[in-house]
Amino acid sequence: MQTPKKFSSFSDQVSWISDEKGIKINDREYAEEMLRQIGYFPLMGGYKHLFRISNTKKYKAGTSFEEIVSLYKFDAELRELFFKYLLQVERQMRSLMSYYFTEMYGAEQKQYLDANNYNHTKRNHATIVKLIATLKRATTTTDYTYINYYRKTYGEIPLWVLANVLTFGNLSKMFRVFPQSLKSKVSKNFEPLNQHQMEQFLSVLTKYRNVCAHGERLFTYRTVDAIADTPLHKKLSLPQSGNQYEKGKQDLFAVVIAFRYLLPGKDFLEFKRKLIKEIDRVNREVEHISEVELLNKMGFPETWKSITKYHLK
């Protein structure tokens, strides 16, 4: 077991980065300020690796501290951009799921707390039990004035109100155990998606939403689960290993594919425009990482911009 690292001042940290890491410091005052604002571990621990020479601990000659900061800021801008549209998808799912559930079962609180109103198979049993417990807790929360108002005024909270306090993860689990008829009604709003593709999209997007919300490193993140194959995977000629696509399944490009199906066309074009702008900016500012390297780390094919050329079916 190694000896724990000792405290070091911001000035000492800058010296360590320069002398021990061999990273160029163009402005010590700027470097100290960035370490003060961000912290050594989130910055260096999270973003230095792309500047290393493969299979060594050495850095590419000429790598500067400013480049590492630029990569960090790029990731922060990515989180903000992706989070905006993840929230948009989340809002629409709240609306559609509560609408179709209430249309089928009615607005009474007891309906969404009834396990019989879900696809109550042996496989889904544990998920449904946990979901109903979550929904019950949400009905008793005092953190939201509108929940308090409905409880005091009407004695219960309809699902279209309660849905606003549920997390993306709650919504994903709820969709997973919806009856097939309800899954179908929701999914038809995103044709040509089928129920399975929709379910996998929600599962993966939940993970990415959490990464964005908690300020974790986004651009290299991968989920354990994967989105289902779509016609876009084939049309984009994404690389395959055997029958499995190597990109656009568990990586950030999987989220882009999901957005292509889930966002209105004009919103996706705006998202794509902003994404191109951020990638172009970091490519100008970061000399020692090529665009191909960066895109590969993100799980993007080099031809990713052509995603809007193809029909979704």
Question: Where are the model-predicted features located?
Answer:
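Acidic/aromatic/glycine-rich contiguous surface patches that form carbohydrate-binding/processing clefts
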Residues: 215
